[in-house]
């Protein structure tokens, strides 16, 4: 029996982190939902037109223009905004990177904007590269600038939804999903030179780089097409148990974020790969069990 006591301490508002995962999700949803609310139409008025094969794009053309504009702003600020004491266009980790020549340039323009607007005390103080590059400047992976490229990825998800609304036959849906997978994948691969750290715009989740958004969208489109075949066309699988988690992702995220330090979710294991893997599987089982109970009780909490 494990007895757990939770101690609640006052939050120091002078050091409160303002950005975060849920905050970024809400901003991305706000931007994309606002565009969809203003420009969306449910009429398939171009079904018999010569451009019917690409009408999923035509229907979203104003939203495409706005989304690409957001992406253009992101790129312009990332690579053209002058950052005091740093090379223009720098997107490295700072610290020890390149012989300590850019010590406080972590994240380049993205980090500079966050520190300028929010202040050092209100963004993440232990960025991922700190362990390797001994960075000195705080950097927030869910900061202001990266929200623009993240919103573009969110819009690409909306494009997938438009495919299902526009094309009613299996073939039309699959063709469009694979088309978008190939387009986003090809552009993303070209930007990062099909590599992990190279290319014009390397893959970088902390910066939410354009290549990262496009490659992530590519895999998302391919996976959605595969699941559509397995679940909807061939009807070989109903989506369980993942459908349970998919109905309540917000509550599962919050529970994990709150209780991941405590038993029975967390407990000490030796830092051996197979033991850590089993512990991770145990975590998944716990939260899937909670999702299953909520599903059976028809309790669904969403944004």
Describe each model-derived feature in a short phrase:
Residues 1-303:
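Alpha-helical transmembrane segments and their immediate juxtamembrane cytosolic regions
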